[in-house]
């Protein structure tokens, strides 16, 4: 056992390969068994490879496996194309036999349909593969064949040399780099092989297209010699058209990775178009006696159909008109009845409304009369009350006025008596006293001091009596009698 435990650890920590990589795992196990028998001293002295080396190796292995799967898919698609080409040829042969077994009729109509059929097929195939097929394509196919043979010989040589070379070590860095380079070369050689196989598949497609073109040309020549023009021939030819178009569409979807197959199919369609043209030219040169009879028969049938259509058309036109008139009449009758009922109802409503209005007016008049009577009664009572109040007021006013007059007379009498007394006193004072005019802020007290020498209450009272004063109020410019 070797001491290189790190390689075992790195191996175990990687993901487990799927069933598609069993061959690769067997080769790795063989390499590891051979490495175990080598010297352990050299392995211990050398450095360990980087961790990413095994990842890169795994990626290269996955790429090679993917290329193998793509190559297998391309081979299966080529086989399917070959099988479909065989089925197309069988359908075309069957359609030719069916046209031979049909009875001839309507000679002028079928060539036109066949020309349209072949022209449509040629136009559709030209649209799907617009590039024409020329001698350059043939020259390119020859060159591709030579290049493919060269690549195949180179790849075989490289595989033989690789099988003779000894297998490298996995332990050292230099050996690891050499192994990665060798495996990269292996990948490139496998890619060259895949490309060469693709070129071979393109050549197979071209051969298939040439075969179909030959079959189509033979069919066109055989159809040019025959006179099958029945309606069943049309249906059979339509079915053949649909089958060929479906097959062509399937071939287009499957021939996405093979460029030269479309060109081969275009050549086939060109052959079909040429056959159709030759058939139409041969059919145009034939007599048209039966066609004239069929046209006359069709014209008579057409006139009979027109007469029947006219008769049926008049009946179809009259029936809806009569039905429409009846419906309109019924609607008019029902409408008139509805209008009459509506008018009668409106009249009755008007009469009822007028009666109601008259009753309301009479009620309003009665209520207005009652209200006026009540108002008159209330006004009369109010007037009587007012008159009574006025009479009582007048009486009270008269009594008061009489009392006032008596009071006024008594007051007047008192005033006269007082005036007389005052006059008598003044006369008495004027006969024996003096006069003084009030100036400034003089009062009875000061005037008494001025004239009597003292302002005693007795002196002041004398002045008051002499002048008829009740209080101490005097004004400027007033003349006062001093007794």
UniProtKB/Swiss-Prot annotation:
Compartmental location: Cell membrane
Keywords assigned by UniProt, alphabetized: Cell membrane, Membrane, Transmembrane, Transmembrane helix
Region Disordered, residue ranges: 1-311, 348-437
One Pfam family here: LysM
InterPro entries (alphabetical): LysM_dom (IPR018392), LysM_dom_sf (IPR036779)
Residue stretches of biased makeup (Low complexity): 204-222, 275-294, 400-428
Transmembrane segments annotated in the record for this chain: 317-337
Role this protein plays: Promotes binding of soluble elastin peptides and tropoelastin to S.aureus cells although it is not able to promote bacterial adherence to immobilized elastin and, therefore, is not a microbial surface component recognizing adhesive matrix molecule (MSCRAMM).
Domain comment as written in the entry: The elastin-binding domain is located between residues 13-33 at the surface-exposed N-terminus, whereas the C-terminus, containing the LysM peptidoglycan-binding domain, is not exposed on the surface of intact cells and presumably remains buried within the peptidoglycan. The presence of the TNSHQD sequence, corresponding to residues 18-23, is essential for EbpS activity but not sufficient, additional flanking amino acids in the amino- or carboxy-terminal are required for elastin recognition.
Name of protein: Elastin-binding protein EbpS
Species the sequence originates in: Staphylococcus aureus (strain bovine RF122 / ET3-1)
Gene name per UniProt: ebpS
């Amino acid at each position: 056992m070797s001491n290189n435990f790190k390689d075992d650890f790195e191996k175990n920590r990687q993901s487990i390969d799927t069933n598609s990589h069993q061959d690769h795992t067997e080769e790795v196990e063989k390499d590891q068994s051979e490495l175990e028998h080598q010297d352990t001293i050299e392995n211990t002295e050398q450095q360990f490879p980087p961790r990413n080396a095994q990842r890169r190796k795994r990626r290269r292995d996955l790429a090679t496996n993917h290329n193998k799967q793509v190559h297998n898919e391309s081979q299966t698609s080529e086989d399917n194309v070959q099988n479909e080409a065989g089925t197309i040829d069988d359908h075309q042969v069957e359609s030719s036999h069916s046209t031979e077994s049909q009875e001839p009729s309507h000679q002028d109509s079928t060539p036109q349909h066949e020309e349209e059929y072949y022209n449509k097929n040629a136009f559709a195939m030209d649209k799907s593969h617009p590039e024409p097929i020329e001698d350059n394509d043939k020259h390119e196919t020859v060159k591709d064949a030579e290049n493919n043979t060269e690549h195949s010989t180179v790849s075989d040589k490289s595989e033989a040399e690789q099988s003779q070379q000894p297998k490298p070590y996995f332990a050292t860095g230099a050996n690891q780099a050499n192994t990665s380079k060798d495996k990269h070369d292996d990948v490139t050689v496998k890619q060259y092989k895949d490309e060469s196989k693709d070129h071979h598949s393109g050549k197979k497609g071209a051969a298939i297209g040439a075969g179909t073109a030959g079959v189509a040309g033979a069919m066109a020549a055989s159809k040019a010699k025959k006179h099958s023009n029945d309606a069943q021939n049309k249906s059979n030819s339509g079915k053949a058209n649909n089958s060929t178009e479906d097959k062509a569409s399937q071939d287009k979807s499957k021939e996405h990775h093979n460029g030269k197959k479309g060109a081969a199919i275009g050549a086939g369609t060109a052959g079909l178009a040429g056959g159709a043209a030759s058939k139409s030219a041969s059919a145009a040169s034939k007599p048209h006696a039966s066609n004239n009879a069929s046209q006359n028969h069709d014209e008579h049938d057409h006139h009979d159909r027109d007469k029947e259509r006219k008769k049926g058309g008049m009946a179809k036109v009259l029936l809806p008109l009569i039905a429409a008139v009846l419906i309109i009449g019924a609607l008019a009758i029902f409408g008139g009845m509805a209008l009459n009922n509506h008018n009668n109802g409106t009249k009755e409503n008007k009469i009822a409304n007028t009666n109601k209005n008259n009753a309301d007016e009479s009620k309003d008049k009665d209520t207005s009369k009652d209200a006026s009577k009540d108002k008159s009664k209330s006004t009369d009572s109010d007037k009587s009350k007012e008159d009574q109040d006025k009479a009582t007021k007048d009486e009270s006013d008269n009594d008061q006025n009489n009392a006032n007059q008596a009071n006024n007379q008594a007051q007047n009498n008192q005033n006269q008596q007082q005036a007389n007394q005052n006059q008598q006193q003044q006369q008495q004072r004027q006969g024996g006293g003096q006069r003084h005019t009030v100036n400034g802020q003089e009062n009875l007290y000061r005037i008494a001091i001025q004239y009597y020498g003292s302002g005693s209450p007795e002196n002041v009272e004398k002045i008051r009596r002499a002048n008829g004063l009740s209080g101490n109020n005097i004004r400027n410019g007033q003349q006062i009698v001093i007794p």
